[in-house]
UniProtKB/Swiss-Prot annotation:
GO biological process, one term: proton motive force-driven ATP synthesis
Membrane topology: Single-pass membrane protein
Membrane-spanning segments: 10-30
Taxonomy of the source species: Eukaryota, Metazoa, Chordata, Craniata, Vertebrata
Annotated compartments: Mitochondrion membrane
Protein name: ATP synthase F(0) complex subunit 8
Bias type Low complexity, positions: 37-55
Main location: mitochondrion
Keywords (A to Z) from UniProt: ATP synthesis, CF(0), Hydrogen ion transport, Ion transport, Membrane, Mitochondrion, Transmembrane, Transmembrane helix, Transport
Organism of origin: Opisthocomus hoazin
Length: 55
């Protein structure tokens, strides 16, 4: 079965990871989000208990 022979597939996998690591990843790390996170105060919501008619 030629699928089990790792000789042609291993260099292809290593080359693709090398391309990802050296070319694509630095470009992705330079990306700055359009909306930076802000420090907002959390508001607590108040819930009213429900009165069940059968209790």
């Amino acid at each position: 079965m030629p699928q089990l022979n790792p000789t042609p597939w291993f260099p292809i996998m290593m080359l693709s990871w090398l391309i990802f690591s050296l070319i694509i990843q630095p470009k992705l790390l330079l990306f700055t989000p359009t909306n930076p996170p802000s420090n907002k105060t959390t508001t607590t919501t108040r819930s009213n208990p429900w009165t069940w008619p059968w209790t």
